[in-house]
Design a protein with these regions (language model features):
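Compact soluble domain cores
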Residues: 2-61
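Short, compact, well-ordered microdomains
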Residues: 56-91
Length: 91
């Protein structure tokens, strides 16, 4: 039985740099993890902030690492209108 995710992703976009580094199948896995509350490689404070944001309506930030060790962020806006995949230096 499918389970509804805790929040919508809205329009999903990715920067060219992120698309160059992350294979499509990995990107889909990360988006699923993000949408189901697995925030990846964030610290405990950011993890707790994301958990609070699910009810408070703040932005959500996940961080994942490529096989080469490059950090990639996934950010869903506070209003859940859009989710962006980007490198931290592009923020």
């Amino acid at each position: 039985m499918p389970v509804n995710p805790p929040f919508p992703l809205g329009q999903v976009v990715a920067t060219p740099a992120a698309l160059k580094l992350v294979p499509p199948e990995v990107l889909l896995q990360w988006l699923h993890r993000h949408q189901t509350g697995d925030w990846g490689a964030v610290g405990p404070q950011d993890w707790a902030a994301n958990d609070r944001a699910l009810t408070d309506g703040d932005r959500l930030l996940s961080s994942y690492l490529t096989d080469g060790g490059t950090k990639v962020w996934i950010i869903t806006e506070w209003d859940r209108s859009a989710t962006t995949v980007l490198l931290p230096e592009e923020y």
